[in-house]
């Protein structure tokens, strides 16, 4: 028998006891309303809306998997359902929520080889003394790691005990042991599963925190207006944030999760608005005149870049977190839109410019110097920088023009070498990619199934899943953590 060490988590507190762009480029059926900027918006709309296609090109490549942390050998993981530890009537419902959520979180991580439950032995362990190593480390499961535990309801509280065992290590198998306590609700069971999954991913995924508790902000028209919504990373718990009855686009959550910047039509035209997630309401933010679109936070949360036509052509400006100290950092004929910061260094900004004709991706230092063109042809929009600063992902129609085949697809490019690979090949318009905090996943919008919906995939283009289905849903933005 092996000594079991547990960490006890109660609600949101942990006690150790010995034991982790952009402008609305296409808004079909939407009427833009401005006072003095109708022409500028028309230019933006013309620049960033058309239906097109592209031919498939490069396949998945090893340098992508390595750079995104997907290149490591996958750990063979067995995750049997947790067992009930009490006979309370709520046990069955909470166990189902917990077990389904834990499995999905670990499967979605992209770094595990999940052993099929059909291979599991009949004797499922709920505690360490019940583990039969030979039943798990040999055929048919052939697992390297085993996740197991129990859940029990007592009164209004639920307690979950969970372990991660290296079943190849017979002398010291325990990698992780945790105990969680919270109110006995399905939401709490789901939260506990997310927390435990993140712990497992952190331990087995190279010390990179999991994304099971992260959120995705997006635009939805399901209420009759384009409002800002938020959902869990897997598409669950979709809920409305704004109720402005207008057109709101380009939601961008701050790195600390306390503020949400977005573009919206107001009485004065297109403005940048700021929403406090702590106060659950809009807070004061300056108006700059002209058309103001596509806000983007710096990695430290102290600055905001956005596109504004306040001086004529749409240009990129930077302000502090309160909207003051405005500074223009681009100056060239033609629209400059959709800025995004290098998320690792904060020293560079990628953006979309029409200075060469059709929109292309460019990079520059955060002060506007050292401008470099990234894409060399076609129609490229919606850049997003990976958390490690190595990759840019964007929407690209490489062969654009009359008679050109295909639609807009998501591409990934190494920012230094300019090597690129196509991630989507499924027709329709694929646009507005955004990186997960761990750099292993990308969320994007796609019209492949008809209307615009939000999808996610691993950063190598595999495991594509639809997250939304009600109404039109666009412009996703993954939280920073």
Model segments located where?
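Short loop/turn segments that connect beta-strands within beta-propeller blades
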Residues: 232-236, 276-280, 320-324, 365-369, ...
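Amphipathic beta-strand/beta-sheet edge segments enriched in Tyr/Trp
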Residues: 62, 127-199
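A flexible loop/linker signature enriched in serine peptidases of the S9 family
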Residues: 220-227, 243-246, 263-272, 286-291, ...
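Short beta-strand->alpha-helix linker/helix-N-cap micro-motif
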Residues: 66-133, 150-151
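Hydrophobic beta-strand positions that form the internal "hydrophobic ladder"
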Residues: 216, 260, 301-305, 349, ...
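Residue-level detector of Asp-centered blade-edge/turn motifs that repeat once per structural unit
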Residues: 211-212, 255-256, 299-300, 343-345, ...
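Bacterial N-terminal signal peptides
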Residues: 40-53
């Amino acid at each position: 028998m092996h000594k079991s060490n547990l960490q006890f988590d109660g609600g949101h507190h942990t006690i150790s006891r010995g034991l982790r762009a952009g402008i609305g480029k296409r808004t079909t059926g939407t009427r833009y309303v401005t006072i003095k900027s109708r022409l500028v918006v028309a230019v933006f709309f013309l620049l960033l809306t058309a239906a097109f296609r592209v031919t498939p090109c490069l396949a998945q490549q090893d340098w992508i998997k390595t750079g995104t942390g997907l290149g490591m050998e996958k750990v063979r993981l067995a995750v049997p359902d947790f067992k009930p530890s009490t006979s309370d009537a709520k046990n069955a419902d909470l166990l189902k929520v917990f077990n389904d959520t834990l499995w999905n979180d670990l499967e979605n991580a992209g770094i595990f080889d999940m052993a099929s439950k059909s291979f599991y032995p009949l004797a499922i362990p709920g505690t360490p003394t019940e583990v039969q190593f030979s039943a798990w480390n040999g055929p048919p499961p052939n697992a390297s790691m085993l996740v197991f535990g129990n859940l029990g309801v007592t009164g209004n509280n639920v307690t979950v005990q969970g372990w991660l065992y290296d079943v190849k290590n017979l002398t010291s198998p325990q990698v992780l042991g945790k105990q969680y306590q919270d109110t006995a609700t399905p939401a709490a069971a789901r939260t506990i599963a997310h927390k435990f999954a993140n712990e497992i991913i952190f331990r087995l995924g190279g010390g990179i925190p999991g994304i099971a508790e992260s959120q995705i902000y997006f635009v939805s028209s399901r209420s009759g207006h384009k409002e800002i919504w938020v959902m869990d990373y897997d598409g669950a718990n979709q809920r409305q944030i704004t109720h402005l009855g207008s057109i709101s686009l380009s939601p961008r959550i701050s790195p600390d999760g306390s503020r949400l910047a977005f573009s919206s039509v107001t009485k004065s035209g297109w403005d940048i608005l700021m929403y406090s997630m702590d106060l659950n309401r809009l807070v004061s933010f300056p108006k700059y005149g002209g058309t103001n679109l596509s806000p983007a936070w710096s990695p430290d949360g102290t600055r905001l870049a956005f596109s504004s036509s306040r001086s004529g052509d749409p240009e990129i400006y930077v302000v502090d977190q309160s909207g003051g100290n405005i500074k223009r950092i681009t100056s060239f004929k033609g629209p400059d839109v959709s800025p995004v910061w290098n998320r690792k260094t904060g020293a560079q900004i990628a953006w979309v410019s029409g200075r060469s004709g059709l929109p292309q991706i460019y990079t520059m230092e955060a002060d506007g110097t050292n401008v470099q063109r990234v894409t060399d042809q076609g129609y490229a929009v919606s850049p997003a920088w990976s958390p490690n600063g190595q990759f840019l992902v964007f929407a690209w129609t490489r062969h654009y023009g009359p008679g050109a085949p295909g639609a807009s697809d998501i591409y990934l490019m190494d920012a230094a070498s300019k090597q690129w690979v196509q991630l989507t090949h499924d027709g329709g318009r694929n646009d507005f990619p955004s990186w997960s905090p761990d750099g292993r996943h990308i969320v994007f919008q796609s019209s492949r199934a008809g209307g615009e919906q939000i999808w996610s995939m691993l950063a190598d283009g595999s495991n594509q899943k639809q997250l939304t289905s009600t109404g039109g849903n666009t412009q996703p933005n993954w939280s920073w953590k």
